[in-house]
């Protein structure tokens, strides 16, 4: 009798838990993009939409999202994160772990490894990832490159950036994505902003901001550091 009761109780609790889990799934868009562009509140303490509504930065990190996932996998991942209540997906265009010459769709990322020659097929894929996220109300916090392309250290590299081509690449990205409704720029990529890196990161950010006045920008430093160490007074840095 006791065993029968226990089994019935377990099945009952399983049904309740399953129902509860289904009810916990968010059914609407992750955010309301119609509230306007994001900005830093005048207090400097939080982010908000241009209509004054506070914005919760609930981010999930998927650095290799653009490089490794195909369209179907991207849709599955973004939908899963929307259901879980995330508002921001953090990812990279030129990522750390995959080769520079091929992506999930079989396209090179750059033609001949030249940062001045972005591969059209790959960046059409980048466009699609941003658009798929926008349709779900998800922001994309986008790194133009991971840090090893500026300062190899423990990464795969190669180091391909100079201040000059970083500015050109940044301006090109700014022109391409300035009207995306769901973008946050992240400069850096687990690297410092000192030494030779300073001029490159500064040029990349300045290039983007020279044409894109619509999106917030921050910096991803290496561990135990803050963007304020190097860029606190930079005109392009909106928040640390």
Language-model segments: residues:
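Bacterial Sec-dependent N-terminal signal peptides
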Residues: 1-23
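Active-site mouth of glycoside hydrolases
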Residues: 26-239
